[in-house]
Amino acid sequence: MLYPICIEKVSDGYVVSVPDVPGCFSAGDTLSEAMLNAKEAISFHIEGMLEEGEELPKSNPIEQYINQPEYKDFIVTVVDVDLSHLMGKAEKINITVPALLLHRIDQFIATHPEYKNRSNFLSQLATNRLLSA
């Protein structure tokens, strides 16, 4: 799931806010560390929200934050947060897919190792689509 983050340079590093996840903040000494810590903070924060019975926060397009005056001096980017471990137990289903589409999915997965297999690919796409709708 892609979440926009807003990174502010401060005297001793970077501070990260996550506008789509209320109350979620992070920091780091370097930009890379700040982004990595933001991914972890988002995952932990959302896990806590779900445990409290709250809804999974919707991710807005990055464009919503790029031109906002409050983020004028910030680096605005996105981080990809794997929330699959929060979705519950996987259930096996059977689906029908046109042969050409299945072939294209397989080709795509072969060149994108972040998608482990067809099921993972389809699950991630469905999750991203439903949570950003």
Spans of model-derived segments:
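A short, charged, amphipathic alpha-helix used as a generic interaction element across diverse proteins
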Residues: 30-47
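N-terminal segment of the canonical double-stranded RNA-binding domain
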Residues: 1-12, 17
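Short helix-capping/hinge SLiMs at alpha-helix to coil transitions
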Residues: 111-113
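Short glycine-enriched loop/turn motifs at secondary-structure junctions
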Residues: 18-21, 87-89
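A short, exposed loop/beta-hairpin motif centered on an aromatic-Gly-Thr core
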Residues: 22-32
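Short aromatic/hydrophobic contact patches that present stacked aromatics
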Residues: 15, 25, 94
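Acidic/histidine-enriched, beta-strand-rich ligand/metal-binding domains
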Residues: 34, 115, 122-123
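Short, charged, surface-exposed hinge/linker loops at domain edges
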Residues: 2, 43-96, 100-108, 119-120, ...
